[in-house]
Amino acid sequence: MNQVVIYTDGACKGNPGPGGWGAVLRSGTLEKELFGGELGTTNNRMELMAVIQALGALKRPCQVALYLDSQYVRQGITEWIHGWKKKGWRTAAGQPVKNVELWQRLDELAHQAGHRIEWHWVRGHAGDPGNERADMLANKGVEQVLGR
């Protein structure tokens, strides 16, 4: 099983507002950078999109070390999602899960695509080179949708 290290990040100028996502994928000596954005979005949606796009870029099941600065995504996929699914995609308070279509896509990629994923939280803007690069790519995604 190929080993891949992934760093992801999302950015939003205003929340909601124009946003971007970025991902850095490394396997051995190979490195791939991905980014994109949307005009009307939120930071949490962009954090989710970064992980979805990164995992979606993998061509076969991999052993993944995934680094992200979003506790929302890390806790959502490792802790909260099981309860949401049991409750028909509702929160503990009975409210519909926000960004449900993205959570469902991430669930499919994370749990049904055959990947073995270790989820690692890193503090954002704390000098981690992979996180800083993903942040730069996310901001590039914002600039792209703004036509700059």
Swiss-Prot record:
GO MF, any single term: RNA-DNA hybrid ribonuclease activity
Domain RNase H type-1: 1-143
Pfam families assigned: RNase_H
GO CC, alphabetical: cytoplasm
Cofactor note: Binds 1 Mg(2+) ion per subunit. May bind a second metal ion at a regulatory site, or after substrate binding.
Record keywords: Cytoplasm, Endonuclease, Hydrolase, Magnesium, Metal-binding, Nuclease
Chief place of localization: cytoplasm
GO biological process, one term: DNA replication, removal of RNA primer
EC number: 3.1.26.4
Residue positions binding Mg(2+) 2: D9, D135
Cofactor list: Mg(2+)
InterPro entries in UniProt: RNase_H, RNaseH-like_sf, RNaseH_domain, RNaseH_sf, RNaseHI
The UniProt record lists the keyword Magnesium: yes
Localization, UniProt: Cytoplasm
Cell membrane in keyword set: no
Catalytic activity as recorded in UniProt: Endonucleolytic cleavage to 5'-phosphomonoester
Quaternary data: Monomer.
PANTHER family, per the entry: RIBONUCLEASE H1 (PTHR10642:SF26)
General function of this protein: Endonuclease that specifically degrades the RNA of RNA-DNA hybrids.
Family under the similarity heading: Belongs to the RNase H family.
Protein name: Ribonuclease H
Organism: Acidovorax sp. (strain JS42)
Classification of source organism: Bacteria, Pseudomonadati, Pseudomonadota, Betaproteobacteria, Burkholderiales
